[in-house]
């Protein structure tokens, strides 16, 4: 969305000043040099100096350390057992565990690595079941169906949230009240507060991986999507949150909201790219950055809109010819939609163990969600062509338009009805992420009266004064 359009638009989530954004950028500059290795934990002085505390520090350090890519199945099992022991101790000890954590960067690493290992194990298990080539591993996985089980992972995340009472604290902050009055014995400890907070972001990610996009957004009801939120102070968490929120919106056909989410984080990344290089998570962020540009290209093709100048230029540079083909529509665009979706979507997982005895019945979750998305794309393939004809008329006969398109009139009627329904989208205004108001998705509307199509087009006026004022403020 351009600057002049933003002046007329509804207020964006977290529309703070450039001064606040600059402070956030400076905060990330410090984070790039943060070392969350074991040495950082060793330098931390805990409230309890006993061996038990040191053992817990070692476990926490291990939990934040990525597992080797080629780790054996036994190593993955052992890692799961270690996580179970760690979280059981934190959640079920007699009273809160007395331990100071280095920073919130580290707390994010623990939750992020926990979910990543769960995700990669589920995909590996599904791959073994579908291939049926390694009977030894298949038997081992068959005998341990609850290892890295969906229920266990969700139980940990929900338990950390409940124990820390982080939702109650966040709700109190939104009401302007003291969060410590709602924190309780556990939530007042930084260890529980940070793990509970980032478990909310973890739930967003897990529910999205499972394909429950509305529940994914629902988990963030008490988190405000702005630059002051705690997740915005950790680049990887900031990026992850906006990626999964934007993707959830896209799968719910709320393309305008998806574009807004992707644009927010991509503009921020463009401002920090000069000192991202050398950071521990640079490669992962660069990959996610490319994925979000692919997703925003899909959204713009399905929901034409103006973009921020920075995003528009980068999108043209990355997907110039491909973007033109997507926006043109037609059957030849289908393979490109699928290619971009597969390259940019999350690595979906199944909530249940696969059937090792019948490999042919196991479906790749990515294939499943790709098929669902492509069904939606097929319903809108001819929208650009139909739109180009309708823009030339105020009234048009259905038979005449069918002749131009070389299709049966009744088939065209179905397309028009589908397009009419898709032209109304829910757009966020205020409140939770799931809330919103139905709005017209584009400036072209029409109505069918028997075989007569009535067309109306509205164009919003450009408010250049606001655009100039906004850019003058940046320069001076």
Swiss-Prot record:
Q: Can the keyword Zinc be found in this entry's annotation?
A: no
Recorded hits in InterPro entries, A to Z, give:
eIF3l, PCI_dom
A GO term, aspect molecular function? translation initiation factor activity
Residue intervals of the PCI domain: 257-452
Entry's localization field: Cytoplasm
> Which Pfam families has this protein been placed in?
Paf67
- GO cellular component annotations, sorted alphabetically? eukaryotic 43S preinitiation complex; eukaryotic 48S preinitiation complex; eukaryotic translation initiation factor 3 complex
Keywords linked to the UniProt accession: Cytoplasm, Initiation factor, Protein biosynthesis
GO BP: formation of cytoplasmic translation initiation complex
Q: What the protein does? A: Component of the eukaryotic translation initiation factor 3 (eIF-3) complex, which is involved in protein synthesis of a specialized repertoire of mRNAs and, together with other initiation factors, stimulates binding of mRNA and methionyl-tRNAi to the 40S ribosome. The eIF-3 complex specifically targets and initiates translation of a subset of mRNAs involved in cell proliferation.
Q: How does it assemble?
A: Component of the eukaryotic translation initiation factor 3 (eIF-3) complex.
Family as reported in the entry's similarity comment: Belongs to the eIF-3 subunit L family.
Q: What is this protein called?
A: Eukaryotic translation initiation factor 3 subunit L
| Native source species | Aspergillus oryzae (strain ATCC 42149 / RIB 40) (Yellow koji mold)
